[in-house]
């Protein structure tokens, strides 16, 4: 894949504040570009975060009371301004014996494109977050990939098979790479070829980008995929990959699948669709609240079981059938009620638009909102990484049309931001540009 996945979305997307029903509850906040969520042997979620581009990638454990415990910090995190991409850690697996494996994505650091091994015992003994220098071992995945005919490497996820070998999904090489631990040897298990672009928009061929790899109960593996630009609806597949590399389509008709897991209630596969791509404001981008959870039958049938959230790249099921989901742009970890076949759709809670004048501006502007009833109004301003820049009280406003003057000229830099106003059960969102 010529462009790293996810982080172009940070720059190109007009994102807004998500509203939650009783079925979706945020349980952790202020996460730094959360990608993956993985559960340990106790069912506790661990969240892999790509950071902000300042070598601040990290892995945190989210305790039942919502507190975050930083286990590993200071991992390579780099923002490429030319490509508009954030590059950092992408996934983590926590083993029952205390080993912690972190999959580090693409980037310029010497530890980019590797899988690093840490250990829980070292964290306990240190009494402080581990750093890269505390690692016990390194799988130099990217070095081998780049030396063996591939232009790029971006290890996204991995699994460890029954023999202790690693199957690595590379989202830039568009291949599954096998690492034999005992022999210290790499090999290509399978590659995913591009297909002809059926539209006049974008490049002549669309890349097939592998994301999550899972073991299939009957042997072999399942590999989810997303497609490159123009991010076509229904063009993503889940593939069945046998141990000899034989590859076939397991399920089709999906869109931008970034993760998948097994539903513990019925044993069926559930795929996470990151978001849909379409018209946003005056341009095309990834549509807020358009992520979906899709139940995938063994026969390939698809059934939507949750919708109206995200963009969300990471999924993990708890033992009771509730799902943990990362929200990339709001920097949150969500948890659902135990899922069943009825669709949980949050579409009716979509935020309302509001008008800002002037826009662009110097940080001083007026926004107009219409309130159904008198209520207290608060504001929240976030940057393009979803980080909170400013919050405050607007005050008690009457029902009807209201002009709300705001002034961020003294404490906010130039650039594009997301402004959200909360008025009780009503939410208003817009994009503002400070020049």
Kindly label every feature range from the protein language model.
Residues 344-372, 382-387, 414, 431-435:
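Surface-exposed, proline-anchored Ser/Thr-rich loop/turn motifs
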Residues 25-28, 68-76, 125-141, 187-194, ...:
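Beta-propeller fold detector
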Residues 46-49, 101-103, 168-169, 222-224, ...:
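Residue position within the beta-strands of beta-propeller blades
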Residues 51-56, 108-113, 171-172, 230-235, ...:
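Short, solvent-exposed loop/turn segments at conserved positions within beta-propeller repeat blades
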Residues 55-61, 113-116, 175-178, 236-239, ...:
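A short loop-to-beta-strand structural motif that recurs across blades of beta-propeller domains
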Residues 5, 391, 396, 405-435:
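C-terminal tail/sorting-segment detector
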Residues 62-67, 118-123, 180-184, 241-246, ...:
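Short loop/turn segments that connect beta-strands within beta-propeller blades
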Residues 30-42, 56, 77-99, 136-166, ...:
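Beta-rich, blade/repeat-based domains predominating
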């Amino acid at each position: 894949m010529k462009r790293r996945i996810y982080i172009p979305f940070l720059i190109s997307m007009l994102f807004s504040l998500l509203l939650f029903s009783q079925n979706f509850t945020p349980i952790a906040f202020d996460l730094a570009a959360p990608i993956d969520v993985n559960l340990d042997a106790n069912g506790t979620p661990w969240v892999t975060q790509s950071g902000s581009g300042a070598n601040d990638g990290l892995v945190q454990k989210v305790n039942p009371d919502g507190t975050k415990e930083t286990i590993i910090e200071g991992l390579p995190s780099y923002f490429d301004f030319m490509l508009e991409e954030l590059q950092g850690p992408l996934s983590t697996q926590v083993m029952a014996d205390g080993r912690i494996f972190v999959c580090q994505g693409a980037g310029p650091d010497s530890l980019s494109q590797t899988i690093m091994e840490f250990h829980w015992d070292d964290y306990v003994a240190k009494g402080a977050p581990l750093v890269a220098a505390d690692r016990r071992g390194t799988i130099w995945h990217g070095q081998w990939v780049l030396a063996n005919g591939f232009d790029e490497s971006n290890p996204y996820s991995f699994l460890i098979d029954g023999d202790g070998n690693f199957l690595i999904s590379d989202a830039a090489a568009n291949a599954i790479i096998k690492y034999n631990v005992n022999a210290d040897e790499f090999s290509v298990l399978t590659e995913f070829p591009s297909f002809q672009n059926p539209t006049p928009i974008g490049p002549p061929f669309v890349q097939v980008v592998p994301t999550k790899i899972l073991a299939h109960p009957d042997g072999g593996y399942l590999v989810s995929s997303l497609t490159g630009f123009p991010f076509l609806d229904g063009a993503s597949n889940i593939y069945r990959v046998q141990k000899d590399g034989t590859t076939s389509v397991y399920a089709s008709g999906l869109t931008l699948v970034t993760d998948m897991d097994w539903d513990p209630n019925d044993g069926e596969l559930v795929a996470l669709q990151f978001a849909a791509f379409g018209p946003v404001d005056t341009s095309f981008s990834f549509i807020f609240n358009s992520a979906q959870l899709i139940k995938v039958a063994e026969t390939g049938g698809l059934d939507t079981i949750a919708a109206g959230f995200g963009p969300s790249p990471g999924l993990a099921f708890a033992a009771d059938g509730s799902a943990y989901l990362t929200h990339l742009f709001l920097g949150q970890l969500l948890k659902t009620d135990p899922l069943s076949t009825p669709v949980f759709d949050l579409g009716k809670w979509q935020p309302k638009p509001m008008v800002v004048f002037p826009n662009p501006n110097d940080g001083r502007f007026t926004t107009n909102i219409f309130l159904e009833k008198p209520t207290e109004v608060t504001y929240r301003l976030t940057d393009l990484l979803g980080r909170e820049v400013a919050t405050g009280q607007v005050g008690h406003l009457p029902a009807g049309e209201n002009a709300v003057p705001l002034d961020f000229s003294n404490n906010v830099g130039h650039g594009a931001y997301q402004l959200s106003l909360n008025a009780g059960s009503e939410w208003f969102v817009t994009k503002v540009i400070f020049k």
